[in-house]
Each structure stands twice: as C-alpha cells, then as structure tokens.
Amino acid sequence: MKWQERIADELAPDLIEKYQLGPIAAKLFALRGINTDEKLDFWFNATEENLADPALMHDMDKAINRINQAIDSGEKITIYGDYDADGITATTIMTETLSILGADVHYFIPNRFNDGYGPNMDRYQDIVADGTRLIITVDNGVTGVEEVKYAQEHNVDVIVTDHHTFQEKKPAAYATVHCNYPGQKYPFDDYCGAGVAYTICRGLMQDTMPELLDLAMIGTIGDMVKVTGEGHIIVKRGLEMLNQTDRPGLRALIKNAGLTLGSINETDVGFNIAPRLNAVGRLDNANLAVELLLSDDDLEAQKIADKIEELNNKRKELTTEVYDKCMTLIHKNSWQKQNTLVLYDPEFHEGVLGLVANKIVEKTHKPTIVLTKNDAGEVKGSGRSFAGFNLFDALNPIKDQYLTKFGGHDFACGLSLEENQIAPLREKFEDDFHVEGGLETKKYDMELPMQGLTPQTLAQINQVGPFGTGDTQPIFSISNPTITHFFKMGKDKNHVKFTVAKKGGNLSVIGFNKGFLNNNLLPFISQIFVQLSLNTYRNQVSLQGIMTGLAFASPKLAVPTPVVDLRQEKYVMGFADRYLLFDQKNIPIVRNRLQIDEDKISLVKDYDQTGETVALLDVPRNQIELNAALEKDYQQIYLRFLLDQLPVEQIPAKNYFGAVLKYIYSHPTLKPADYRTVAPYLGLDYDSVLFILRVFFELGFVKLDEGKLVGEPSPKKQPLTASKYLMGTSSQIKFVNQLRTMPSQRLITYVNNLTNK
C-alpha cells in the first residue's frame, strides 16, 4: 500500500477569520473543497429548511396524490421494507407518518432466510390476497419487475421508493420515487432508503418533519451513503435530534449500548446503534426492530431492546465462530497460497456471511466468497473485495454459467448457486483473478502538528464533521517518530500502545490488531498514520491517536548490519529497495496480497543491480539457489522467507499413498476435475493429492485413459523412494525447514559466510 498526502489550495484568510477556524480545521476544509463563503455557510448553518423541494424528485407529486387518495378512501396500505438498519428506519418513517395522517397502514419486512432481499413474488401474492390496495416499497423495489407487474395486474398500485442502482429493466410501478432517477431535477442523488422515505414524508406533510431526522440519520450512517450535501444536513441535524430523543425504543437501545444521551456522535451510531438494528434481520425477523422504533411504551421498548441485545451478542458469537471455521478451511486446503477464496460449509449461519467475508478480506487481502446451504437446500452466500478488484465485474460475466442468483456492486455481492457448481466457481474465480491499477493507494490529510495537542484540537477537527462517506474522518501523518513506552495489551496481546514524541509534543497511540509490532520493528517505522479521539481515564480527558497505518524505511544505522533476520515478523514492510523472489508464481501473491509495488519485485535470476537493500521473500529450495541469491553485492539483506516454492509442506505419510491408490482402482471414472472434491474425503488437502498423483505417474502406477485417471493393471513393483520427484521434494523440504528454524544468530553467521566467499 502507498500513502499519499492530499493537496489543496489554502483557504482565504478572510474566510478563516469569519468562521473562526483554527489552522487544522482550515486545512481540512480546503482539502474537502469547502472553500467558499457559500459552502462554509451551508456547512455550519444549513438545517432541514435548506433541503430541496420534495416535488423535484421523480414521480413525487404522483406518489403523494396516490397516497392521499388511499388515505381518504380508507384503502389498506402495506409498506414493504427491508431487514437492514436503513430498511428498518425507512419502514418506521413511512409507517409513523401515514399513521399520523390516519391511514390504514401496515408494514412487512421480508425474512432474510425465507424471502431474501427485495420484492418476493410469494409475499406480493400474500399481500395482494390480504386486501392491500397500495404497496409502498422502501429501500427496495427497483429489482421487482415481475412482482410489481403482478400487483398492478391485480389492481394493486405499487409506489417504488428506493435508492439502489436500476438494472436493465425498470419495474412498471404506479410511481417510482428515486433519488438517482435518470433526468430528475432533485439536486442530491445519494440518499439512503430512509432519506428517500423522509423526503416523501416532507412532501406528504408539507413540513420539514425534524422529528424524523433521527431515524433518517441512522439509516444514512448505517447504509454508508454520502454525508455531504443534503446528507450533511440529515446527519448533523439527525444527531442533534437523537441526542434529545424521546422515542422509548431509541432510548432503550442507547441505554443497552452503554451510550449517554447528549454526547452521541456518528461513530457511536455506526458502531453501536446501527449494528444492533442490523443484528435483528441477520438472526430473526426484522419486524422486531420496527416494533422497537414505533413503540411509545417505555416498558415494552426496554423488553424489545433487551431481546435485540441478545441477538446482537449472538451475532458477534456466530461471526467469530464462522470466521474461525473459515480460517481452518483455508489452512486445511492450503488455500492460503491462492489469490481468491471461496469457502463453503452447509452449517455456516447465513446471517453473518457478509460480516465474515469482510473480516477475511481484511485479514488476507483476498477477494472472498462465503457460502452456506439454507433449509430449502439452496447454496447462498456473500462476497467481499477490496480496492483494485471489482467483485461485480469479476462475477457478472460468469453468472449465467455458475450462478442461479447474483447481485451486488464493486466490493460486495450476494449470490446463489447449485452445490455442484461450488468447485467449478472456485476454480474459475481463481483463474480469472486480476487486480486493476497496481498498488493500492491510501490518502492522508496532513502532517499532525505535535506541539500544543489538547482535547480542544479534536473539537477543531470535528468542525469538519460529522464524518462518513464522502467526508471521511481525517487521517494525520506523524513522520520520523520517536517511539517510547511501547507495550502490548489485550487478552491475546493483539493490540499495542505507545507514546510518540516529536518536536516538543507527544501523543499516546493505540494500534488495534497491530500485535505483529515489536521492539525490533520500531526503528523501521518512518511514518505513523492516525485518527484522533478522546480518552477518558480516572475522569481525566486526553487526546489519543488510533493507528490506521504505517510506513517503513531502512533505519540509518551508525554501523550497518549486512544481514537482518526478519523471519519471525508477521508484517512485510515497504522499506527495501528491492524484493527478491526465487519462484515466479509468487510474484502475484507479493504484488496483490502483500501490496508491494511491482516495480520493486524481481526474480533472483534476473536481478543484476548492486548496492541496494534487498529482502528475500521466499525460501530457496536448495544451496545452489541460495548461493545464486547471495553472489550479488548488496548493501543489506533482509531475510523474510515468508513464502516457499514447495508443492507440499511435508511428504504425506505412506498410508495416504495407499489410500489414494486404492481409491483410484475403485473409482475408474475419476477425472482431474474431481481431485479437489476427493481430497477432503481422503483426509488430504488438494496439494497433497496432486503431489501423490505426480509420484504415481512417475512410477507408472497410474495413467490417464481418455481423460480418466485409472490404475495400471500390472505396475512394476518399486518403492516410493524410487521417485526422483518425491526424494527431491523431501530434500527441498528439509533445506527449507532448516532455513526457517535455524537460530537467528546462526542463520546470520551462515549467510554472512556465504556472502564473503
């Protein structure tokens, strides 16, 4: 990963004076393009009174007239919502408003497991049969071409209100109210479902409806849509309303989350409130969450909130459980060497697949699809990716060949498929893997001025908030830091804490999930990237940094060390001039997964520079390869030995060779495409099966006959040790293990001796 500083012209001095901006806030506003009197005035002073006329949104007047007609004539109205925080708040906004207007209004939230996302034909048929005369979708509907058609043909009008991307064909609804409808005149196009619902209710009531802003804000933050433009008004004013809310449901939810009314910010909503609402739909029927938000009874609301708290705790447990099982699958099948992951277990809980896939991407930096089987026998799953790999573009061209259902966007997707298509999908997904744009670049805002840091510094920064999509929380750089008081913390010592000192100032920094850091690595740190927050300890409030990234450089030593042992470090650092590999197959792993610039990667056999600092990232297979790497004139060598070139980590035991051969003789229709499926049945990983088969081919025990693997009827009797491939691999494994396990000082001496020959 590359870090790059944002650049922008400075704010005019008169604007800085008019809005009383400190130097940090002034720089941050300039970087975000909020650099004129009009823009700054909007940022500080705009309220719901400044929102655009709802009538500008596509089909708004038509929708409002139809809703008023239904209310006047006493028609039954059903709000068709969604099971995430956005859909839940949108359903609540619409239901509450129509109830105030005296409508015969009901709501329906589809069940994630039985109904799936969006319009469902069976549920539409039920709603129509139950006497509904008007369906209003919220946070869904644009995919419901057939469902909407069915309702309209049965004299039930459908008003689609949504914000998701239109597909090739739009539903022929009575009205479609959408913030990004082609050609519409509404000036803001990135509302969430709750934002669209709130806009409709403004139009219905001919009022700004500030009492709905707390719900619209939760949907906005939960769905990660823009918090700029009108989104800024929704979130800023919504937080103000939330902090003085009298909704029993929200007050109970806030209490259970351990938050305090009056001091809740956007981070609290994103990490504590929205996830609790999401948890309901992940594990149960999301109607429960709507009941909570609509409740006007304190005791009832607390009872529902307590149930939601149980579900949220269960969601956390299931996420950890499925994640751990996925990591076991990866190692059991040697998939850590792949560029992509497709993980399946029929027992995985469907409600947490997306959360787990996201955690695995964060851990492995690999596009990941996690699959399970539902009660109907359908294999369903969620996928997640990262910047540089468009998941939708990767799967969309092959959806008709492998998938029964598919939808998503750049970095997330949902899909369904037949169970017998999992292995072919895994293979195709891996074969087609390609990262666009090279090394991922992340931007930071500015160098942190270390002198005079106080809690008031954060107040200055927060003038640029509330933060979210489109206005991200600022990231600051601390260059060439002096690090002291370093220690690890947490149950498993996965987190670190230390003090950074520079130019007369210091800052306490916490690094979550940065347990790979240790005292040996601290001299290599050239930049620390942090976001600032407040820490309260024993009633004392202080400023602290939350680490978001690191950059490394070779330390300037008075006496250079020719060889440095970094085998035990769990982090590949971007400080070497050149990263050397013995095996060409490891190049995409280093480039894509380890995020090292391809221009800095070379094969040992092609490298001809001198005087550079180099890192050996994979392990040589033998003494000859190691000698070839060490015959160059380096300034310094870092021994990382992270990857290897071995076909297997260890030679399978003899009984496994017998089991595989027996299986081949008893299954004469076995094809190469079946090897991966057969491996778990035999208690082996895929690489071990391939290794055993290669030995068998060499010894003449098996052959391919018209594309099928069959055993030779009368093979020559000879021991496994007659295989040159087996014996050569065994020797390579021994050499690799020696290099990986040799005591540090002994290894350094050994390599030094080779370089001095």
How would you describe each model-predicted region?
Residues 8-134, 154-155, 172, 205-424, ...:
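Hydrophobic helix-and-loop "lid/oligomerization" segment in the mid-to-C-terminal part
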Residues 82-83, 110-113, 140-141, 163-166, ...:
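Short, ordered loop/turn segments at secondary-structure junctions
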Residues 90-94, 145-154, 163-164, 354-357, ...:
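Short Gly/Thr/Asp-enriched flexible loops that form oxyanion-binding sites at enzyme active sites
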Residues 99, 233-323, 385-392, 396-403, ...:
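Acidic, two-metal ion nucleic-acid-processing modules in DNA metabolism proteins
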Residues 117-126, 130, 134-145, 601-607, ...:
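Glycine-rich, anion-gripping cofactor-binding loops and their flanking helix/strand elements
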Residues 138-191:
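Histidine/acidic-residue-rich, glycine-tolerant segments that coordinate divalent metal ions
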Residues 149-161, 198-204, 623-641:
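A short, gly/pro- and small-residue-rich
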Residues 172-222, 628-629, 638-641, 651-659:
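Short alpha-helices
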